[in-house]
Regions:
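Glycine-rich phosphate/pyrophosphate-binding loop and the adjoining helix
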Residues: 5, 140-179
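N-terminal beta1-alpha1 ligand-phosphate binding loop
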Residues: 2-31
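A generic structural motif
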Residues: 29-35, 139
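N-terminal beta-loop-helix "entrance" segment that forms/cooperates
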Residues: 37-55, 154-159
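Helix-loop-strand module that forms the ligand-binding subsite of alpha/beta enzymes
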Residues: 56-137
Length: 179
């Protein structure tokens, strides 16, 4: 069974992106094994602590390596993705063997889907920049993406209700992650 690893770019408990991820998990159902990466204990990338690798880094690299597909759900902060998500991707891009830049990293060639929920621009900028970064670190970014403009009323209730059209777009991305 295919293993899909969800990475939620927002740490907020009632994150709209977490809500989208939960909907995606429901869409996938039992057709794949879905798990969510907990990277809340990941230290900031610092070459002084890179080797030996911190326990959180080792755990995360193992989890990423064992997944078939990564699906990132990202908000947009000041026209980009969150700093803690960038930190995670920086760690994943680093060589496991010190200074051995010829050895593939755990994200090289990994298929990655990107979705995002945010303001009126539907995370267009953060998804574009994330696509650029992931391509640079040699991940295989799926062309199908979904950007969701969170309606004004949801900002007051912390509840995101997807439209039928958004649900269909989410299903289309889910199908690409499964196949």
């Amino acid at each position: 069974m295919k293993k899909i690893l969800f990475i939620i770019g927002s740490l907020r408990a009632k994150s709209f992106n977490r809500q989208v991820a939960n909907e995606a998990k429901s869409v996938i159902g039992n057709r794949a094994e879905v798990s969510e990466l907990d990277y809340s204990d990941l230290p900031l990338l610092n070459q002084d602590i890179e080797q030996p690798e911190p326990a959180a880094v080792a755990r995360i690299r193992k989890t990423v390596s064992e997944s078939d597909v990564i699906w990132i759900f990202t908000p947009e902060y000041n026209l980009s993705y969150p700093g803690h998500l960038k930190n995670l991707l920086d760690w994943l891009s680093r060589p496991v063997i010190p200074m051995d830049y010829g050895t593939p990293t755990c994200i090289n060639g990994k298929r990655v889907a990107i979705s995002g929920a945010g303001g009126k621009a539907a995370t267009a900028s953060s998804r574009a920049k994330l696509t650029e970064l992931l391509t640079f670190i040699k991940a295989e970014v799926l062309p199908e993406q979904i950007g969701i403009a969170v309606p004004a009323e949801a900002w007051g209730t912390d509840v995101l209700v997807l439209t039928d059209e958004q649900k269909e777009e989410l299903k289309a991305v889910a199908e690409k992650t499964i196949n």
